[in-house]
Amino acid sequence: MDWGNLLKQAVDVGFTLLAQADDAPARPAPEGHSGVRTAPTADRARRIAYAPELDGAADPGEIVWTWVPFEEDASQGKDRPLLVVGRQGGELLGLMLSSQHKREGDPDWVAIGSGEWDREGRESFIRLDRVLEVGEHDIRREGAVLDRARFDRVADELRGRFGWQ
């Protein structure tokens, strides 16, 4: 049996399901979900370092999936990818990704191109002005590792505009 091929097929199926979930309608928070908190990025300024390690625990530089509430109605939301930019104990700090092209040119969003986190290969954008605080146990899965150059571009924006180190 070719385990490598089988694993690749399983990952492909997972990415397909997640891409469909990204386009899914809003829904209430999942049962037992402790909640995602949001804060202005400057209020969570800290040292940022690239440290991905696909070991089952989310680390800075990894893109993970979790349920994210809508700003206009926090009781509704959907599964979204987040770039992990920090951690404190079991809490992760993440920046939300979007594949909506209306984000292009918006100063609160930075383009990072496409990657394994989006099965359809769409260009993605990371929101800079809103940090999401997520419990480690609320992460649905690890999605991908953002390469060092793109992570550094995001980190430079956080340092230059929001006081991160």
Predicted feature residues:
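An N-terminal domain-cap segment
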Residues: 54-55, 75
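C-terminal terminal-subdomain/extension
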Residues: 1-25, 114-165
